[in-house]
Amino acid sequence: MATGKIVQVIGAVVDVEFPQDAVPRVYEALEVQNGNEVLVLEVQQQLGGGIVRTIAMGSSDGLRRGLDVKDLEHPIEVPVGKATLGRIMNVLGQPVDMKGDIGEEERWAIHRAAPSYEELSSSQELLETGIKVIDLMCPFAKGGKVGLFGGAGVGKTVNMMELIRNIAIEHSGYSVFAGVGERTREGNDFYHEMTDSNVIDKVSLVYGQMNEPPGNRLRVALTGLTMAEKFRDEGRDVLLFVDNIYRYTLAGTEVSALLGRMPSAVGYQPTLAEEMGVLQERITSTKTGSITSVQAVYVPADDLTDPSPATTFAHLDATVVLSRQIASLGIYPAVDPLDSTSRQLDPLVVGQEHYDTARGVQSILQRYQELKDIIAILGMDELSEEDKLVVARARKIQRFLSQPFFVAEVFTGSPGKYVALKDTIRGFKGIMEGEYDHLPEQAFYMVGSIDEAVEKAKKL
């Protein structure tokens, strides 16, 4: 085990000099005793002359030149397997929930090759989420990748919590949650929400919050992914939740300049597409088991053309776009049914009835969107009878796309609803065909199935 010395510290980037014949390889872990703490560094570049440039996985405060650094001769390794379920860990796989050791039987390196082309498998099977707007407009595939796009405060984390709760209770699968650069409060809420829903023993939690150094946030997604890969390789169908993939990119941007790389567009790292690819190519399903991933993607300044969300788009099967405009109408989940897409929305996959219903809903909402300008200038009375009917149905559809969530019961005061796909299709088909034209539009707001809307109308 070779020993080196620190020669330079710039923020999160630390240069270490080793003997010429024992230079650590790229991505190997190094350890340095910093006061009472043991700090782990990860090698990023070999600069020549025995010097390696590393990223610190913790705070580099208190480091100084001349400190001894040990080469561990392997990449960062984290616990995997069933022992991680119900536990909160950090980027190094150390427990942070004060419940003692993980007691794992196996540790895996966080840097691994993606499965080969022969091992991959694709599935056409749908994953029912119980959320109407998602199941109808942008259905998820088992073993697929989903992105939740949205600006600040439109409900990405709440949507993700609801998905975990529904899938854990209705499908009883294992989940891994990687919290990348998000608020500590959200991590805390999340843990308590999972405990209250009695699904904590099916979820492994890996956190690297906003206050952590960039090296930590850059690697915590890989830690979570490694745990998910282990479950997949045991032949299970596992869910991987990443909140938030943008912070992973941002952490790369923060260290990129310190590593001496030229910035590219908007100041992002020049290796943006490659870094995203390395992570995304590993999130995949093999012939042994599947990883279905749901990734929250923060959209800076609500601009979907920003390089970070734009790079993420390319890797996804389904995109759920959350809109501030819909949130401002009080319709939650604030999913934009015209912007959200899914590769699965194909009559050969979902069936003709589902496909026709989804496209019908989109065309009615699109027509309403076009008529809004006329209504704003001339008022409703100037519309033809046909258009008035379209507007009335569109407004009902818009309200019916809202739904009370289990994880948001404290905010909404109404009990959560899980809606089966067949009920969702039946409801929207009925509204489109005019079966519910006689009901007031308030009846459709914040209900589960269409039968509840009919009941609610009787009380209005």
From Swiss-Prot:
Pfam families: ATP-synt_ab, ATP-synt_ab_N, ATP-synt_VA_C. It is a peripheral membrane protein. Keywords: ATP synthesis, ATP-binding, Cell inner membrane, Cell membrane, CF(1), Hydrogen ion transport, Ion transport, Membrane, Nucleotide-binding, Translocase, Transport. Signal peptide: none annotated. It catalyses: ATP + H2O + 4 H(+)(in) = ADP + phosphate + 5 H(+)(out). One of its GO terms (cellular component) is proton-transporting ATP synthase complex. It is an enzyme of class 7 (translocase). Its EC number is 7.1.2.2. It comes from the Bacteria. Disulfide bonds: none annotated. ATP binds at residues 150-157. It is found in: Cell inner membrane. GO terms for molecular function: ATP binding; ATP hydrolysis activity; proton-transporting ATP synthase activity, rotational mechanism. F-type ATPases have 2 components, CF(1) - the catalytic core - and CF(0) - the membrane proton channel. CF(1) has five subunits: alpha(3), beta(3), gamma(1), delta(1), epsilon(1). CF(0) has three main subunits: a(1), b(2) and c(9-12). The alpha and beta chains form an alternating ring which encloses part of the gamma chain. CF(1) is attached to CF(0) by a central stalk formed by the gamma and epsilon chains, while a peripheral stalk is formed by the delta and b chains. Produces ATP from ADP in the presence of a proton gradient across the membrane. The catalytic sites are hosted primarily by the beta subunits. Belongs to the ATPase alpha/beta chains family. This is ATP synthase subunit beta. It comes from Klebsiella pneumoniae subsp. pneumoniae (strain ATCC 700721 / MGH 78578).
